[in-house]
Design a protein with these regions (language model features):
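Conserved helicase motor core of P-loop NTPases
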Residues: 1-94, 100-102
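Aromatic-residue detector
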Residues: 11, 15-19, 46, 68-69, ...
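Contiguous effector/interaction surfaces
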Residues: 92-99, 123-129
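C-terminal accessory regions
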Residues: 107-213
Length: 213
């Protein structure tokens, strides 16, 4: 949770700075890499540069509990302001959990609430009243992260053995990281997971060894 607070402090501080400067979130600018983007996209890029992944949904280190704890910790640091955790509050990240072709939002899409009643998906602004089923996205399951890559991936494994932990699941989590991987796990659980092979995966052992080094 502490690691999440420090990493998410970046995009939330950026958001507060833009508000203080009264930036139009849909206005475009040229970033330090010479790329044209909107201020909303810049905040989303900051949020998406790091992703926290966990193996389970329901446990002390599952996605549901960690999403709750991270939100409360960010509020304690005065980086977020909300009364109830399920409120729409500025800075809240969400992940769509069902397809809605009318709104053109699909399972796995990530958005940020950056203004009252409005969520941005890239440079697209959608009213909160039109958002389909969703959940907080401070933390997501390794399974849900398939197909995505992040500059920095933080992977959290449970403290007790669980049938869902497998070599393939670890492989999925490890390969989400483009440049940096952090793992929160005790050695016994890690070794148990990488030995639990569901199906053969060519080159997996070598990749895991390289990542550990």
């Amino acid at each position: 949770v502490k690691s999440a607070v420090e990493n998410y402090r970046v995009y939330l501080t950026q958001l507060q700075t833009y508000f203080a400067q009264k930036k139009d979130l849909n206005a475009k600018f040229i970033d330090e890499n010479g790329c044209e983007k909107t201020y909303a996209e810049a905040i989303l890029d900051s949020f998406n540069s790091v992703r926290f992944l966990t193996a389970l949904r329901a446990s002390a280190l599952g996605v549901e509990e960690l999403n709750r704890e991270i939100a409360l910790a960010l509020r304690a640091e005065k980086l977020l302001w909300f009364r109830q955790e399920d409120d729409w509050y500025i800075g809240k990240p969400i992940m769509i959990t069902e397809n809605d072709h009318n709104v053109k939002l699909y399972n796995g899409d990530i958005g940020l609430c950056l203004a009252k009643g409005k969520v941005w998906f890239g440079n697209r602004e959608v009213s909160t009243s039109r958002i389909p089923a969703h959940e907080p996205a401070f933390m997501m399951t390794i399974h849900k992260s398939q197909g995505s890559e992040f500059e920095h991936t933080v992977m959290v494994l449970p403290t007790e053995p669980n049938p869902v932990l497998s070599r393939e699941l670890v492989f999925t989590g490890v390969t989400r990281a483009k440049n940096q991987l952090s793992v929160f796990a005790n050695e016994k659980i890690w070794q148990s997971a990488v030995r639990n092979t569901v199906k053969r995966q060519s080159g997996l052992g070598k990749l895991l060894q390289e990542k550990e080094e």
